Amino acid sequence: MYSPFSDPPIVTIEKSSYSVNYGNTVTLTCTVTSTPLHTSVYWRKIQGGQRVNVDMTSSKYSGSTVNTPSLTISNTDNNDETFYVCYASNIIGTGQSSQTYLDVVGGKINLFFFSNF
């Protein structure tokens, strides 16, 4: 049954970028406004030029649920530094946020030594 008050979710991210020190935890804040209520939330990140789903089965990530749509990333490393997008779906459709960039500050430096000997 159609209702003029039914739309895909409106998904917003609090900031256009976040910064975290290497090894620390960061939460990318996502809010969802939805009528009818949203039934799922998921995140994607840019990896190799493609949007890929964030692997929520990994203990590195938490959140990304209907009740807690924000994404928390633990033990951040250089692989986490990229763009992220939050998505939410209801029976009408899927909405997505604008992208946010996570900057991981510091981290491991790979040193290579070359010898002419």
Predicted regions and their residues:
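Extracellular Ig-like/FN3 beta-sandwich strand-entry sites
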Residues: 25, 38, 79-83
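Core motif of extracellular immunoglobulin-like domains
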Residues: 30, 43-45, 86
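Extracellular beta-strand/loop-rich beta-sandwich domains predominantly from IgSF
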Residues: 17-18, 58-92
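Short beta-strand segments of immunoglobulin-like
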Residues: 15-21, 32, 115
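Proline-centered linker/hinge motifs at extracellular inter-domain junctions
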Residues: 6-11, 15-16, 36, 106-109
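Solvent-exposed loop segments of extracellular immunoglobulin-like
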Residues: 35-44
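Surface-exposed loop/turn motifs at beta-strand-loop junctions within extracellular Ig-like
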Residues: 34, 47, 88-92
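Extracellular/luminal immunoglobulin-like beta-sandwich modules
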Residues: 1-6, 85-108
